[in-house]
């Protein structure tokens, strides 16, 4: 298959990164990639979706990954997977010899191994420059569910209409379920039995980089997990703090221990981000050197500094995120052409063990099986967002009153970076706005 043909199939079928920011997958297909890398590092604590999906559909996913390798002409296809995922590794080893040029790379159980910059270094030894893209190093990264969605688009002619989501923590029956896009978080949580605390908080995504959601929020193409947490949990409390309070606390109790840059994954790969210098400058209104502020652009927001490193429970990640947002609003782009310094010699000893991270965050007791159930959950109504990806929102091609069937395109890719959106249920369109489409099931 030619690259352009595969790009068109992927774009029209709405395949984007099934996690993170939802980068349109078709844009990653280029003959500049001499290595393609599958991310099965399950970056966040408690998440098990990717290892489950890869174990269940090992052959289909590997076959598709090999097809991508041949299409772009990559010399090597690497599956990055944590060495503790024994059952999934066994499933992969049953087929690995069928795919020339494909190999497994076993990873340590540390956080944030799923950060693509970290993963690329671990699997290939290549360092992506600060603010750069993986393809500059000849690498294209795909996660497991994304590759499975490519398989469904190419082999089964099925667009992306549903999402696998894990529901864990304060629920009676932790589970990973397949749900239609646009259903509510509450409907997903209901599949895990009953909640085990009063007034639970829905934490969408992983505990390190996730957000607090509302029960009525719709599931999107990037929704990986819902953590049901007590309202007084440490993670919830950290997420609810305000920037003004965070800044005052930094000014009054930062002890200048320097642990935040010592453990910062990007800093240890030679990137110029330095949380300690930023906190020192920001908390003292010190603008004599602007580099600590400008270098905030290179923060990955992994949260190691804020959730693990700081002995004073300060919030470098949150304040850096505010700075990044302010720079964007002011039209200040990250410096271009910045080259990384040499990788820290002590980097191997500065990795954050995931088991220790879970203990520090009060999550160890939630680390339980969440069995994968593939039967599609049935709902009565969906609210499908037109922007579930990086780039321009899709443009609606249906109107209120139209009858649609599951899998039908309801919004076409816009000009520029964009993908199609499809009906996740069959029914009647009841509302169309510039942000979403509502479909009621008959």
Model-predicted segments: where are they?
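Flanking helices and flexible, charged tails adjoining ferredoxin-like Fe-S electron-transfer domains
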Residues: 2, 19, 46, 125, ...
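Histidine-anchored nucleotide/phosphate-binding helix
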Residues: 36, 55-72
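Gly-rich Lys/Arg/Thr-decorated short loops/hinges at beta-loop-alpha junctions or inter-strand turns
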Residues: 38-50, 171
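Hydrophobic alpha-helical positions that pack around
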Residues: 75-78, 83-185, 191-198, 206, ...
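Short, compositionally biased
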Residues: 207-209, 243-247, 418-434
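Ferredoxin-type iron-sulfur electron-transfer modules in oxidoreductases and energy-metabolism complexes
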Residues: 229-251, 261, 266-343
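Short, Lys/Arg- and Gly-enriched loop/turn segments at beta-strand edges
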Residues: 234-238, 411-424
């Amino acid at each position: 298959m030619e690259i352009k043909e595969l790009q068109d199939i992927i774009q029209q079928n709405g395949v984007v990164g099934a996690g993170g920011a939802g980068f349109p997958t078709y844009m990653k297909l280029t003959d500049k990639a001499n290595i393609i890398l599958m991310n099965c590092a399950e970056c966040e604590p408690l998440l098990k979706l990717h290892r489950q999906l890869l174990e269940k559909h090992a052959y289909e996913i590997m076959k598709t990954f090999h097809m991508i390798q041949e299409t772009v002409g990559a010399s090597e296809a690497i599956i990055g997977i944590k060495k503790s995922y024994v059952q999934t590794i066994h499933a992969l080893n049953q087929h690995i010899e069928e795919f020339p040029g494909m190999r497994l790379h076993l990873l340590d159980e540390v956080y944030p191994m799923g950060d693509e910059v970290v993963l690329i270094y671990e699997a290939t030894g290549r360092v992506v420059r600060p603010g750069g893209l993986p393809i500059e190093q000849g690498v294209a990264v795909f996660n497991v569910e994304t590759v499975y969605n490519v398989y469904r688009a190419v082999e089964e002619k099925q667009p992306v209409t549903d999402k696998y989501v894990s529901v864990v923590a304060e629920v009676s029956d932790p589970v990973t379920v397949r749900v239609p896009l646009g259903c509510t978080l509450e409907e997903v949580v209901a599949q895990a039995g009953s909640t085990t605390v009063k007034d639970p908080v829905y934490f969408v995504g992983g505990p390190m980089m996730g957000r607090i959601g509302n029960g009525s929020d719709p599931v999107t193409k990037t929704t990986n997990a819902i953590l049901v947490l007590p309202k007084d949990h440490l993670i919830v409390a950290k997420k609810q703090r305000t920037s003004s309070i965070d800044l005052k606390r930094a000014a009054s109790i930062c002890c200048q221990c320097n642990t935040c840059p010592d453990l910062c994954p990007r800093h240890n790969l030679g990137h110029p981000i330095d949380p300690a210098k930023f906190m020192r400058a920001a908390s003292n209104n010190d603008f004599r050197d602007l580099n600590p502020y400008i270098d905030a652009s290179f923060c990955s927001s992994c949260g190691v500094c804020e959730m693990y490193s700081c002995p004073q429970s300060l919030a470098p990640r949150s304040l850096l995120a505010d700075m990044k947002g302010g720079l964007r609003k002011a039209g200040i782009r990250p410096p271009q052409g910045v080259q990384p310094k040499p990788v820290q010699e002590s980097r191997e000893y500065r990795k954050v063990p995931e088991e220790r991270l879970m203990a520090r965050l009060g999550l160890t007791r939630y680390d339980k099986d969440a069995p994968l159930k593939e039967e599609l959950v049935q709902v009565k109504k969906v609210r499908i967002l037109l922007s579930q990806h990086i780039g321009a929102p899709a443009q609606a091609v249906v109107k209120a009153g139209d009858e649609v069937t599951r899998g039908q395109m309801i919004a076409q890719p816009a000009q520029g970076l964009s993908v199609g959106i499809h009906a996740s249920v069959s029914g009647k369109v009841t509302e169309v706005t510039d942000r979403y489409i509502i479909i009621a099931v008959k």
